[in-house]
Amino acid sequence: MGAALGTGARLTSVPRIACSSLRRQAPSAPAQGCHSKSGPPRPVPLKKRGYDVTRNPHLNKGMAFTLEERLQLGIHGLIPPCFLSQDVQLLRIMRYYENQQSDLDKYIILMTLQDRNEKLFYRVLTSDVEKFMPIVYTPTVGLACQHYGLTFRRPRGLFITIHDKGHIATMLNSWPEDNIKAVVVTDGERILGLGDLGCYGMGIPVGKLALYTACGGVNPQQCLPVLLDVGTNNEELLRDPLYIGLKHQRVRGEEYDDLLDEFMQAVTDKFGINCLIQFEDFANANAFRLLNKYRNKYCMFNDDIQGTASVAVAGILAALRITKNRLSNHVFVFQGAGEAAMGIAHLLVMALEKEGIPKTEAIKKIWMVDSKGLIVKGRSHLNHEKEMFAQDHPEVNSLEEVVRLVKPTAIIGVAAIAGAFTEQILRDMASFHERPIVFALSNPTSKAECTAEKCYRVTEGRGIFASGSPFKSVTLEDGRTFTPGQGNNAYVFPGVALGVIAGGIRHIPDEIFLLTAEQIAQEVSEQHLSQGRLYPPLSTIRDVSLRIAVKVLDYAYKHNLASYYPEPKDKEAFVKSLIYTPDYDSFSLDTYSWPKEAMSVQKV
């Protein structure tokens, strides 16, 4: 071993994907933006040793390090004298996980694993995405955010406050990774259906980016979660001694806007104009405004508006295969008129226009109910978004009355009002139409407009149901069993992000979210529809995300949105070459020898 080191040995890692600081196996297609062919992988020195390796979640393998690796990395003796495969480590984690009584405890186990061993964390998630998604994201992540101060273990992500204005570029330089391709940012004002959680909202960007990798295969080292802390108006948090954020009322107005402007500019200055920035859980007052302000200037989108719209429209398009008619034959009533409702409505209008329906006629098919009743022309204090969908109709106060008058084919709940779809509403829907569409999309489960069981029972199994949070299968008295579809945004944003990153897309038009919806709907088989599913099983989500990414990439090149040239001939192979794998890196010595005469020792 000593002789090997003396002949030019370097400690390296054998790579498995591109864009990593470690040496990995060459991908089937190059991951560089130029798309040029690369030669054989060259050794890259691994500079970390000892505790710096075992405490680095990107490098740590726990007891999966071989004896040779332990000796060369200076960690022999720092790990128990046992050698485990990743499969055995997975089994060990699963046994401990299954012994936990609460979902919050399970969440904590997974997050601490992510902090300790990133590869094993994603091996666990990808082993059963359907099982773990409700834990790492909705609905459990909402509970985790509410208890963030109590469960806080280790900082993850970048916390930028209103007091850091003027210095955001410096703060970004503190982040240990330079090759960031995706940022998820929130200001914590509207976390799921739970309201203002301030700094506790960091759990959302962390959870979203975990799904970027688990569902889409985006390299986690290229992802950055960000919390913009401008204060909180949640009095309970302001009184909480465990609260980890700024303890003052939210800063608004020009100072807030200046912070956002500086943040967007600093991110693109540091990581490039192609860096994807996903806005998450901003309040209605800011969500639309910031989307309209930045969408044509930066590579960004708002998941609550555009992601929710895409997954909801995907469910509706799949439902058309059950109702056996066209989108233009349907009338929609929304419970809620916030960012999610408006996003869905706008994308529905686009889909209707694609069917040949004029925009003015398409808008007439969409009725919205907010806290003050039906949105109608002439009603005071309507913002620009609501004015677009205001109907020429007398005022109506309740959702039940609107449903009776309009007789919609579909009702869509996105207002986080638990139980809003009453038995009377469901009975009316079932009496109006043979196959009524009922989407209870609010998160978390406690905020759902109705349960799957209630919908199927009241409509005698004729309701076409989808929800935002997961519900178990329902068996009716006649023996029929339905498996409700979950309209989870995770069907959308990982694939879109992967496609955007792959093509270096500068701006993300709404057409990308419509083609994503169409692709998701195509993934639903007739067997799934017969079971009540409007979405493909979550177990297939990585394959779905890959096909979405390829569609996005193809659209980008056809419409001159991509910035990487030349265009890859085999887009699927190219995207596959970028996908992160949770397989462990193999650390090895890069050994070689000089010619004997070159190594001869000179003597006096």
UniProtKB/Swiss-Prot annotation:
GO MF annotation: an example: NAD binding
Name under which the protein is recorded: NADP-dependent malic enzyme, mitochondrial
EC numbers for this chain: 1.1.1.40
Phosphoserine found at: 371
Binding site for NADP(+): 190, 304, 443
Compartments it resides in: Mitochondrion matrix
SMART domains: malic, Malic_M
UniProt cross-references to PANTHER family, sorted A to Z: MALIC ENZYME-RELATED, NADP-DEPENDENT MALIC ENZYME, MITOCHONDRIAL
Cofactor binding description: Divalent metal cations. Prefers magnesium or manganese.
Keywords: Metal-binding, Mitochondrion, NADP, Oxidoreductase, Phosphoprotein, Transit peptide
Active-site residues, Swiss-Prot/TrEMBL: 137 (proton donor), 208 (proton acceptor)
Chain segments carrying region Disordered: 28-50
Binding annotation for a divalent metal cation: 280-281, 304
GO CC, alphabetical: mitochondrial matrix; mitochondrion
Keyword Magnesium recorded: no
Annotated GO biological process: malate metabolic process; pyruvate metabolic process
